[in-house]
């Protein structure tokens, strides 16, 4: 029986290698890389869809319309229970969002969902998540008399 007492491994060096042209068509290389990009995009989209599937969507509401009109925009909308509603001061007038205690589902504490402090700067926001199904009436305290009132239906 023969025994191996030592072995040598030779690793070639590529430091002095000269570039070789590939015999593959550049069109094939482009197609292959586009295929990889498409596959990566599909994976990213699927991952995004899974993330969105587990989280609630959002509803944005402007406090004041473009042009300075004192309204909620939109002023009548629906959301699913657990979706976030973000109210955004659009023009810089002082606005707030007060839920009317006589116009919300029974048992809802309006002090926990209202923003009674004024949002005074353009871009300031207030977000609320409503979880009890029903209809909620809300208004802007300083501008309710001018018609700045709204309604959200939670399904």
Swiss-Prot record:
GO terms for molecular function: copper ion binding; electron transporter, transferring electrons from cytochrome b6/f complex of photosystem II activity. Pfam families: Copper-bind. Keywords: Chloroplast, Copper, Electron transport, Membrane, Metal-binding, Plastid, Thylakoid, Transit peptide, Transport. Cu cation binds at residues 95, 140, 143, 148. It is a peripheral membrane protein. One of its GO terms (cellular component) is chloroplast thylakoid membrane. Residues 59-155 form the Plastocyanin-like domain. Residues 1-58 form a transit peptide. Its cofactor is Cu(2+). InterPro entries: BlueCu_1, BlueCu_1_BS, Copper_blue_Plastocyanin, Cupredoxin, Plastocyanin. It is found in: Plastid, Chloroplast thylakoid membrane. NCBIfam families: cyanin_plasto (TIGR02656). Belongs to the plastocyanin family. Participates in electron transfer between P700 and the cytochrome b6-f complex in photosystem I. This is Plastocyanin, chloroplastic. It comes from Hordeum vulgare (Barley). The gene is PETE.
């Amino acid at each position: 029986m023969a025994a191996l007492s030592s072995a040598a491994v030779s690793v070639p060096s590529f430091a002095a290698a000269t570039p070789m042209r590939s015999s593959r068509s550049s069109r094939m290389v482009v197609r292959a890389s586009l295929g990889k990009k498409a596959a990566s995009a599909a994976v990213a989209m699927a991952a995004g869809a899974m993330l969105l599937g587990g989280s609630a969507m959002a509803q944005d509401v402007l406090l004041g319309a473009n042009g300075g009109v004192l309204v909620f925009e939109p002023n009548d909308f629906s959301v699913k229970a657990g979706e976030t509603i973000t109210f955004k001061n659009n023009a810089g007038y002082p606005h707030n969002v007060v839920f009317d205690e006589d116009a919300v589902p029974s048992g809802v504490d309006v002090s926990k969902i209202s923003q009674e402090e004024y949002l005074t700067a353009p871009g300031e926001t207030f977000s609320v998540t409503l979880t009890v199904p029903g209809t909620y009436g809300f208004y802007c305290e300083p501008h309710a008399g001018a018609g700045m009132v709204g309604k959200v239906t939670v399904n």
